[in-house]
Amino acid sequence: MNLIPTVIEQTNRGERAYDIYSRLLKDRIIMLGSAIDDNVANSIVSQLLFLAAEDPEKEISLYINSPGGSITAGMAIYDTMQFIKPKVSTICIGMAASMGAFLLAAGEKGKRYALPNSEVMIHQPLGGAQGQATEIEIAAKRILLLRDKLNKVLAERTGQPLEVIERDTDRDNFKSAEEALEYGLIDKILTHTEDKK
């Protein structure tokens, strides 16, 4: 069972209780703190769209601590980040792996961050298939197309040549915050909240 903390806010109109995620959303902070599936993606996309409608000029911060997950769900978040007008900064806390790393790199260039002890892991898509030979062939072709699409976006987002991305994503490739910075997955390592400004 997941308990969600409640925070009490005092205003001149009295007290108001929020669940922590609603309170963070009020400050334009979205938390991706789980594996990425369709439900998580729908929640993140809804929050992005809400904040974009509320103020199309004000930056949104997406904090990521995720082992990755579904490619199609992750691409829904990615496409929405590119689609909306507000700039989306990304901050890795803990681990951004697989699709989590992809979304970290997808933040506004110059506004992609990691905390000092966080880790980033990139790799090629994982998948499986069963059934008749033709169905397996169709699934294999699809996963290869997805791999090529993800690699092209990562090359564009990091500034690395496509061949380097293809080589480096062949297996699980873990990077410290410093290595992620050198690689171009992030733009800065944050040690204090003021560093983000």
Curated annotation (Swiss-Prot):
Its main location: cytoplasm. Changing S46C: Has peptidase but not protease activity, activated by ADEP antibiotics. One of its GO terms (molecular function) is serine-type endopeptidase activity. One of its GO terms (biological process) is protein quality control for misfolded or incompletely synthesized proteins. The active site is at S98, H123. Changing F50S: Protein no longer oligomerizes, loss of protease activity, activated by ADEP antibiotics. It is found in: Cytoplasm. Disruption phenotype: No degradation of trans-translationally tagged-peptides. Triple rqcH clpP ssrA mutants cannot be generated (ssrA, or tmRNA, encodes the SsrA tag added to nascent proteins in stalled ribosomes by trans-translation, targeting the nascent protein for degradation). PROSITE patterns: CLP_PROTEASE_HIS, CLP_PROTEASE_SER. It is an enzyme of class 3 (hydrolase). GO terms for cellular component: cytoplasm; endopeptidase Clp complex. NCBIfam families: clpP, PRK00277.1, PRK12553.1. Belongs to the peptidase S14 family. Peptide exit pores open in the compressed state; in this conformation the active site residues move apart and the protease cannot be active. Cleaves peptides in various proteins in a process that requires ATP hydrolysis. Has a limited peptidase activity in the absence of ATP-binding subunits ClpC, ClpE or ClpX. Has a chymotrypsin-like activity. Plays a major role in the degradation of misfolded proteins. ClpXP is involved in the complete degradation of the site-2 clipped anti-sigma-W factor RsiW. This results in the release of SigW and the transcriptional activation of genes under the control of the sigma-W factor. Probably the major protease that degrades proteins tagged by trans-translation. This is ATP-dependent Clp protease proteolytic subunit. The lineage of its organism: Bacteria, Bacillati, Bacillota, Bacilli, Bacillales.
